[in-house]
Amino acid sequence: MSAVVQQQGDLLLNVYIQPKASRDQIVGLHGDELKVAITAPPIDGKANAHLSKYLAKAFKVPKSDVYIIKGELGRHKQIRIVTPKLIPPEVSELLE
């Protein structure tokens, strides 16, 4: 499966998370996943909450439209974004 897949108006992202980074950003491809750096530490779900908030802002959707489908406790995650209003250029160039 590729890093970014469009499915019935939603986006499925296969991401690799880098917690405790110096800034929040979508880095680019990391193998067959999209690498996302976030500033939050991987403690008590803080990284997941921060990731959801960051992706919601990047894709211009409410936080409730960002779902972590797989990988709740690991760095490799699958995320569904429901009908994104905006697709960042780092992601749109990876769309099939």
From Swiss-Prot:
User: Which Gene3D superfamilies would you find in this protein's record?
Assistant: YggU-like
Q: Which InterPro entries match?
A: DUF167, YggU-like_sf
One GO cellular component term = cytoplasm
Q: Which Pfam families match?
A: DUF167
Member of which family? Belongs to the UPF0235 family.
* Protein name per Swiss-Prot or TrEMBL: UPF0235 protein Sputcn32_2690
